Amino acid sequence: MENIAEHFLHRFFYPASIALIGASENVFRPSYHLVSNLLKLGYAGPIYPVHPKQKEILGIKAYPDVGRIEAVPDLAVIAVSQAQTPGLLDDCIRKGIRRVVLVAGGFSEIGADGRRLQEEMAGRVRASGVRAIGPNALSPINPHIGLAVSFHALDRLHSGGLSLIFQSGLYEPRLRWLFHDANLHLNKLIDLGNKMDLNEVDALSYLVHDPLTRVIGLHLESIEGDPLRFLDLLAEAASLGKPVVVLKSGRTAAGAKAAASHTGALVQGNDRVFDRVLTQVGAIRAESIDEFFDLCRALERFDGLALAGNRVVIATMPGGEAVVMTDRVQQEGLTMARVSAGTLERLRPVFPPWDMPANPFDLGVTMQFGNPVTVFETLVASLAADPGVDAAHLQIPDLLLGLPRETFGMF
């Protein structure tokens, strides 16, 4: 795509103005944060809170309905109950709003009645040409412009190269942790919910071509878009050097049943086949939520760094972990590096006489009997200079976290 701004998702991430239907000034209500986040994060466009009774919300003029807003908002977030959502969607369509986010749950994920309501809304969206995220969704987030549609208080966002696609609010309880404690560097985030209109293929088609996206994290409970197009986009991302980390739930029969009750997802196909296909198109599958976020963060931080080869050194404090990591190296198709005789000679002075250095390195006893800083700096410098070493897995004890950055920049 030559001009990413022409993609229909672009204005979801860069809305010129926002209507927040269901916004509240009550700090104990989740919808309070719809307005407060935009103000704290510095969103620069007009904000139009919509509330049937309140005249003002956090110092901003409120409107009893979207029809009373003087302008036509670029994006509307409908954060009300399931029963109110269809009527307010109709109000947005009549107002001429072209992009909506439907926050409420209680549609296809609850069974036949909810599915019927969702299908009726989908028909009205298609007939009007409006594009919709959700229902059962809460997004988007774009740190570059201070945009955060969330029920959690966000004081700051760190912008970076990681873009995230979710099928549910899996990320929502972790938002403050991701941005504050885990220090996640985010480019864009979209929660697709029940995927009544926009789906994972739409999101990928935008982010794969987004020049600010360097890594993509994708959470799926089902695939609603064209499966071949989905795989083509994953392969295209790999060809562009954009890693895609996939967390797909519903792998077991029980998980598939839970997914259906959560977002109304139909989990298709054999999971082992899905696993192999992901490998063929160059995507990376995460086995757990923690691994998903760890992989996303690591790939974003080390973007542009490529291994010269597959020879790995392991150095840990307990020897047991070194054994576990040695197994993992083999499982991932890597090899244990053959450390040169010269490197081993440089390391001998910092190792006890009875503990000869070898890969994998067990540093527990060594650091007890020597200066831990000297041991670690000597190890890093020696391994970095060894032409037979392409990468190292180093376990860094807490007492060394204050070392200068130059120590860790030797590789």
Model-assigned labels for residue ranges:
Residues 1-411:
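Catalytic-core regions of core metabolic enzymes
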